[in-house]
């Protein structure tokens, strides 16, 4: 393999991932050597003494000395400095990428059906009233909700990322203000106003009231739904490769897959990037230095291992050999594409 390592990989079901992690941490016998944690769980397990302090290992690492890191790497890594069991800030995890952010996708077919000019939406910075007016037009045309979100609150920072136009500048939890003081964002007027906007949208039939129980997969299924009574038309979800995934899934179901990723509305200003999930070495590991050197420090080696982490395994997820690949079905049936020798291409999964 590219890593040269022999290890056991445990991959719990996505929806029950942190329940599985919590169960594994109940005993030294079941605690893994390495675990992938989101920001909240990362801070929690670090403060409880379950994670190995990799600060010194990072400072002397080949990756840090390589000169390969981009200018934003410091921002990613500084966010990983959290309090340990002794209250001292240290680096207990490593993330080889930025956290990404959610953006809002609107189905063009829904705009068209509601008589909304695409040119008035695409590439425009809308204010909330204009945006909400478009949502009401689409709801009136379809006769039901427009948005079905994966919960009213996300389970990781920044928490408000699945309904950004409604939360706007509100903060769900404590944050450091411009004076350097920590304040309770949930108790502020901005949050009260945000909750009122959400309540109004539910009462107006804009937001699916079942959003409170939705998982991410439930919300995606409603966006892909071929049932006109349950299909949603506006979905705030991850940017980047997820845009292609959403389009592919819509096409597979025979739905129009043209999506418009709108700019952040005026009151929001910018989509908020989450703190990247990070790879952590637990205190149960018998050789944390070795794990760091051969598992963590090779993730951004600029070669085969980095390629593995970014694109998957050659011959399984991608290849460069000359071949004709049959793509997944869409509304027009199967399609094939031919690649020349040396041409990078993904393989259907």
Where are these regions (language model features)?
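Extracytoplasmic/secretory soluble proteins
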Residues: 1-349
């Amino acid at each position: 393999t590219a890593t040269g390592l022999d290890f056991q990989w445990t991959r719990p079901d996505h929806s029950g991932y942190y329940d599985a992690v919590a169960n594994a941490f109940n005993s030294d016998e079941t605690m893994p050597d390495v675990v992938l944690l989101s920001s909240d769980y990362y801070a929690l397990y670090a403060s409880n003494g379950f994670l190995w302090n990799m600060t010194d290992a990072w400072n002397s690492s080949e990756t840090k000395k390589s000169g390969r890191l981009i200018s934003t790497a410091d921002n990613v890594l500084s966010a990983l400095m959290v309090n340990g069991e002794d209250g001292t800030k240290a680096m207990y995890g490593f993330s080889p990428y930025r956290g990404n952010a959610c953006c809002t996708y609107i189905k063009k077919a829904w705009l068209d059906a509601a008589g909304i000019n695409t040119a008035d939406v695409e590439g425009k910075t809308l204010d909330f009233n204009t945006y909400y007016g478009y949502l009401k037009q689409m709801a009136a045309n379809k006769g039901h909700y427009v948005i079905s979100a994966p919960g009213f609150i996300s389970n990781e920072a920044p928490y408000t990322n699945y309904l950004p136009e409604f939360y706007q500048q509100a903060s769900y939890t404590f944050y450091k203000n411009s004076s350097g003081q920590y304040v309770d964002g949930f108790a502020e007027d901005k949050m009260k106003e945000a909750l009122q906007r959400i309540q109004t949208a539910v009462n107006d039939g804009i937001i699916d009231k079942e959003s409170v129980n939705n998982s991410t997969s439930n919300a995606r299924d409603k966006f892909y739904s071929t049932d006109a009574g349950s299909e949603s038309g506006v979905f705030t979800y991850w940017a980047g490769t997820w845009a292609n995934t959403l389009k592919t899934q819509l096409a597979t179901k025979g739905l129009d897959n043209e999506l418009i990723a709108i700019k952040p509305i005026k009151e929001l200003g910018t989509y908020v990037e989450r703190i990247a999930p990070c790879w952590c070495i637990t205190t149960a590991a018998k050789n944390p230095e070795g794990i760091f050197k051969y598992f963590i420090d090779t993730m951004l080696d600029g070669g085969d291992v980095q390629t593995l982490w970014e694109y998957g395994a050659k011959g399984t997820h991608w290849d460069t050999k000359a071949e004709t690949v049959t793509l997944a079905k869409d509304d027009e049936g199967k399609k094939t594409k031919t690649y020349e020798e040396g041409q990078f291409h993904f393989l259907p999964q």
